[in-house]
């Protein structure tokens, strides 16, 4: 019923009437053809019952706002009919509404926003494409940055690997007094052996006195360019060495 009503309203709105003066210059060339077309259209739609349409605002409520059909026709034209230049004006005069674009026709009960959504789809697609391109550019920048970092790390690792064998060679050197029999790195400081002059002076001082006072220790350290701690440790080691020698010496019968 809604389809028949729509067609009847559609036909009534586009059938030319007697008092339509604006159609006179359009079809002034064939008055006989106009009369025949009016009779045909009246006979075709006379059997259908008239149907009254309500306003869009009363059906859908106050939330629906009327849309201008002219703006809709400007926004998107899915179908445009190009009339033939054969000179035959019968088809054009019988049904002139067939030449108008589809969005310009006032269909009540149908939303006119569908073509606007269709028009916005390419814009949304283009926006998504731009975001994809931006992401691709960002990933390309990240890959180039990582590719730049990898050679630098490789060069630094290569230089570090070159330094490690040199250090191991120094540790494995038998002439190095800091290396022990396991050839392992020691967390302790390297030994600072005493010079022959320092050793000789310390031996002389030890022969005179096995224990040094604080003042004498300070004087010996200042003369031999040593610290008080070094002088103290040397005297401790020398006393332990003397005790060991006395223990290993055979006792007299």
Curated annotation (Swiss-Prot):
Its main location: nucleus. The keyword Coiled coil does not apply. It is found in: Nucleus. Sequence-specific transcription factor which is part of a developmental regulatory system that provides cells with specific positional identities on the anterior-posterior axis. GO terms for cellular component: nucleus. Residues 142-188 are annotated as: Disordered. Residues 187-246 bind DNA. Keywords: Developmental protein, DNA-binding, Homeobox, Nucleus, Transcription, Transcription regulation. It holds the Pfam family Homeodomain. Disulfide bonds: none annotated. It comes from the Eukaryota. Residues 159-172 have a biased composition (Basic and acidic residues). This is Homeobox protein Hox-A9b. GO terms for molecular function: DNA-binding transcription factor activity; DNA-binding transcription factor activity, RNA polymerase II-specific; RNA polymerase II cis-regulatory region sequence-specific DNA binding. Belongs to the Abd-B homeobox family. One of its GO terms (biological process) is DNA-templated transcription. It comes from Danio rerio (Zebrafish). PANTHER family: AGAP004664-PA, HOMEOBOX PROTEIN HOX-A9.
């Amino acid at each position: 019923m809604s389809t028949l009503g729509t067609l009847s309203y559609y036909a009534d709105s586009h059938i030319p009437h007697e008092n339509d003066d604006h159609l006179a210059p359009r079809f002034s060339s064939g008055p006989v053809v106009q009369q025949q077309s009016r009779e045909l259209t009246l006979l075709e739609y006379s059997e259908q019952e008239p149907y009254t349409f309500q306003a869009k605002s009363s059906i859908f409520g106050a939330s629906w706002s009327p849309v201008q059909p002219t703006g809709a026709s400007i926004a998107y034209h899915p179908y445009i009919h190009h009339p033939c230049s054969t000179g035959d004006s019968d088809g054009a005069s019988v049904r002139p509404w067939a030449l108008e674009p589809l969005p310009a026709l006032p269909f009540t009960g149908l939303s006119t926003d569908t073509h606007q959504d269709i028009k916005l789809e390419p814009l949304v697609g283009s926006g998504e494409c731009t975001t994809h391109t931006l992401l691709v550019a960002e990933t390309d920048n990240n890959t180039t940055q990582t590719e730049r970092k990898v050679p630098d790390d490789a060069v630094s690792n290569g230089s570090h690997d070159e330094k490690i064998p040199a250090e191991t060679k120094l540790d494995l050197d038998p002439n190095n007094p800091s290396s022990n029999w396991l050839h392992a790195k020691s967390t302790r400081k390297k030994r600072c052996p005493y010079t022959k002059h320092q050793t000789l002076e310390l031996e002389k001082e030890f022969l005179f006195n096995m224990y040094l006072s604080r003042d004498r220790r300070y004087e010996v350290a200042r003369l031999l360019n040593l610290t008080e701690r070094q002088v103290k440790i040397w005297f401790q080691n020398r006393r332990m060495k003397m005790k060991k020698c006395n223990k290993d010496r055979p006792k007299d019968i």
